[in-house]
Structure formats: structure tokens, C-alpha cells
């Protein structure tokens, strides 16, 4: 029983820590708008400025380690 509980504990912890939206840069559609998901494996990245400067997007938000650029033209 202890082994089963330990295995269940490991599965729950791994499912919480391994959530990844995208491993590579890819386009997504959210409410009929194109959104690009950038994989940025660095801390302290300003996603809003990155999206506006390099992706010609109107806005961007961060969900580490990803930047989501919205309204990409």
C-alpha cells in the first residue's frame, strides 16, 4: 500500500510540473485570432516588448517558459 501511495504521489507531482503549452514556436488560434506561442527558456523576459518588436504583434503575455503574442499581423 505504501508503494502504491508513493507511485500515486509521483504521478501527481509530475503531472503538475510537466505542463508545457508548446515545445517549439507554433501558431494557435484563440477566438478566431492568431496567437503565436514562443518557447523562451529564460527568466526575466518581457514578453510584451518581445512580441511587439519581433513578431509585429499588438500585445503579448507570459506564462513561463512561454510568451504568447496576440493579434499577430
UniProtKB/Swiss-Prot annotation:
One of its GO terms (cellular component) is extracellular region. It is found in: Secreted. Belongs to the long (3 C-C) scorpion toxin superfamily. Sodium channel inhibitor family. Residues 24-73 form the LCN-type CS-alpha/beta domain. The keyword Transport does not apply. Putative sodium channel toxin. Keywords: Disulfide bond, Ion channel impairing toxin, Neurotoxin, Secreted, Signal, Toxin, Voltage-gated sodium channel impairing toxin. It comes from Tityus serrulatus. This is Putative sodium channel toxin Ts39. Expressed by the venom gland. One of its GO terms (molecular function) is sodium channel regulator activity. Has the structural arrangement of an alpha-helix connected to antiparallel beta-sheets by disulfide bonds (CS-alpha/beta). Disulfide bonds join 37-62, 47-67, 51-69. Residues 1-22 form the signal peptide. Coiled coil: none annotated.
Amino acid at each position: 500500500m505504501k508503494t502504491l501511495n508513493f507511485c500515486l504521489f509521483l504521478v501527481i507531482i509530475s503531472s503538475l510540473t510537466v505542463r508545457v503549452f508548446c515545445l517549439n514556436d507554433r501558431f494557435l488560434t484563440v477566438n478566431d485570432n492568431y496567437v503565436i506561442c514562443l518557447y523562451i527558456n529564460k527568466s526575466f523576459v518581457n514578453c510584451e516588448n518581445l512580441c511587439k518588436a519581433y513578431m509585429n504583434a499588438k500585445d503579448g503575455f507570459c506564462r513561463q517558459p512561454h510568451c504568447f503574442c496576440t493579434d499577430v499581423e
